[in-house]
């Protein structure tokens, strides 16, 4: 005598016409399928298929006394459904009975395939899948684990499916995001609670090509950690939010290990930098490789990395600007540099181990004499250590420029400039800085030229304190800044002879000079590197 229900089949033992001994025995087990919809639209489940490589699912069961005979085996079971619908964040269940057999062991490979579609859109059919060995599909606390990963009649086994929208990223744990596609970064940037959470960690899992995407709208503030993981974001176009523009308007977190390639920052009237308009956090081991950044506004600030490295907590370290990067001041009185427009604000903001390559160029057409530098436009009591600039600056209007720093009010240590400044209007040009501050263990081989109305000095055009600083420049004999003429060296060999004294002056800075043995050694006789 057999009885069946939707979820179970069992048998009763009967002697003759009188029930003398009634015994229940489960003959089936039950799969419970749990579906959770995390997508914004309502979905329904139309089918679930359980399959295996071998034919392990019997379609028939014959019972004679204590003997069970399974027949007509198949390698799959199907549960068809018509009304299992879920709105956003809803949970639904489906059930499928099956005959458990000894063939189903912990090493049996199973595949669970659910067919789903968006409610009201039959053309949106898709499948989601879970697969693995029985021992891999269940955790150690599960029923099947307690039965040595064998299915047992009369028990229920749960398999869960999560319907997750393809947002382009994966939340690996609370607050930790792995970006896999361009839309992943875009979608995360649109979540203020993610951007302003100090516990947020965003890691790139792939290079991102943003060239076909709409212009990036800068995130107002970022407080978490963005780890580029050595990946590259290419083709990014950034539009100003208000007066400012950057990947972030204010970075109060950490940006590291990220390259922006062929980045465009459209005309800005305030602060502009590819990574951050204003940096109050850390930007480390980041690269700009090709691109164009333009500002036009009174008191604007422009740098390839950041417009303003602002506070005592601000740090730019081991960053590089290379490739065909063009920085342009189209108008206004602007503080601009290859790396940062302004460093510090009467505070000890820091820049360390960073550089500007020779392919980078600067075009100045501002109104009024802004401060322009190969590395930093205006250093306002910030510190600069172990840096260099090889960029070319061309000024078509009046300008105050330095090969490394324009206006300087802070210490510059173990750094050099070996680029070019061409001034086509009035102004002041210094091979290292336009004026001011303290220079220690620095040198300039900058090529300096200008009209008759331009003051040109080998190191600084204004008052400056310098220790073990030298310049090498054809046609320029005046070091400037009330510095002794002995600060000029005749050639690369003479500068190389200064290594010992320069390294003694910068001892403790974390950097040291070494002789350059490369093909560009005539222009760059000494290289700066970490003193490890």
PLM segments and residue spans:
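Tryptophan-paired
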Residues: 1, 44-145
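Single conserved hydrophobic/aromatic residue that forms the stacking wall/gate
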Residues: 1-6, 10
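Short, low-complexity export/processing leader segments characterized by acidic and small residues
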Residues: 10-13, 164
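Surface-exposed ligand/attachment interfaces on beta-rich extracellular proteins
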Residues: 14-22
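Conserved "repeat-terminator" motif of extracellular CCP/Sushi domains
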Residues: 21-28, 96-104, 151-165
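A short, Gly/Thr-enriched small/hydrophobic beta-strand-prone motif that recurs across taxa
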Residues: 23-36, 316, 351
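Extended extracellular/luminal ectodomain segments enriched in beta-structured repeat modules
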Residues: 27-30, 41-45, 255
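Predominantly extracellular beta-rich ligand-binding scaffolds that present long acidic/polar faces
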Residues: 138, 166-532
């Amino acid at each position: 005598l057999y009885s069946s229900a939707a979820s179970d089949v069992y048998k009763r033992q009967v002697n003759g016409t009188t029930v003398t001994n009634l015994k229940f025995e489960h003959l089936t087990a039950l799969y419970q399928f749990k579906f959770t919809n995390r997508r914004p639209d309502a979905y329904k489940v139309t089918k679930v298929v359980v399959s295996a490589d071998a034919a392990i699912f019997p379609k028939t069961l014959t019972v004679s006394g204590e003997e069970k005979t399974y027949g007509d085996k198949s390698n799959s079971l199907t549960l068809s459904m018509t009304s299992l619908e879920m709105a956003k964040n809803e949970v639904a269940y489906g059930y499928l009975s099956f005959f458990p057999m000894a063939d189903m062991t912990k090493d049996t490979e199973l595949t669970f395939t659910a067919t789903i579609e968006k409610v009201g859109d039959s053309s949106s059919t898709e499948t989601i899948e879970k697969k693995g060995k029985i021992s891999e599909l269940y955790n150690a606390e599960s029923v099947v684990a307690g039965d040595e990963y064998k299915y047992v009649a009369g028990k229920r086994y749960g398999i869960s499916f999560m319907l997750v929208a393809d947002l382009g990223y994966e939340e690996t744990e609370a607050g930790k995001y792995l970006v896999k596609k361009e839309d992943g970064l875009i979608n995360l940037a649109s979540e203020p609670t993610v951007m302003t959470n100090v516990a947020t960690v965003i890691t790139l899992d792939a290079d991102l090509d943003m060239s076909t995407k709409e212009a990036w709208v800068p995130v107002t503030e970022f407080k978490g950690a963005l780890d580029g993981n050595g990946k590259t974001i290419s083709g990014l176009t950034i539009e100003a939010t208000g007066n400012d523009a950057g990947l972030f308007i204010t970075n109060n977190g950490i940006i590291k290990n990220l390259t922006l390639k062929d980045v465009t920052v459209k005309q800005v009237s305030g602060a502009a930098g590819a990574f951050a308009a204003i940096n109050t956090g850390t930007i480390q081991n980041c690269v700009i490789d090709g691109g164009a950044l333009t500002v036009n506004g009174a008191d604007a600030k422009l740098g390839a990395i950041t417009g303003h490295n602002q506070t005592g907590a601000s740090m730019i370290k081991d960053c590089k600007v290379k490739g065909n990067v063009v920085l342009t001041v189209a108008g206004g009185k602007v503080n601009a540099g290859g790396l940062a427009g302004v460093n510090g604000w009467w505070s000890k903001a820091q820049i360390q181990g960073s550089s500007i390559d020779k392919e980078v160029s600067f075009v100045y057409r501002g109104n009024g004499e802004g401060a322009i530098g190969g590395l930093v436009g205006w250093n306002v009591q910030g510190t600069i250590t172990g840096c260099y600039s090889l960029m070319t600056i061309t000024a078509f209007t009046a300008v105050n420029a330095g090969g490394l720093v324009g206006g300087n009010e802070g210490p510059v240590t173990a750094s050099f400039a070996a680029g070019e400044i061409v001034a086509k209007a009035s102004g002041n040009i210094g091979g290292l800085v336009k004026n001011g501050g303290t220079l220690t263990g620095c040198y300039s081989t900058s090529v300096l030229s200008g009209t008759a109305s331009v003051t040109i000095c080998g190191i600084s055009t204004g008052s400056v304190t310098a220790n073990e600083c030298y310049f090498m420049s054809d046609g320029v004999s005046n070091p400037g800044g009330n510095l002794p003429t002995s600060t000029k060296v005749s050639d690369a060999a003479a500068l190389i002879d200064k290594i010992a004294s320069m390294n003694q002056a910068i001892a403790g800075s974390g950097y040291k000079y070494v002789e350059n043995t490369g093909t560009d050694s005539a222009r760059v006789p000494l290289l700066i590197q970490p003193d490890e």
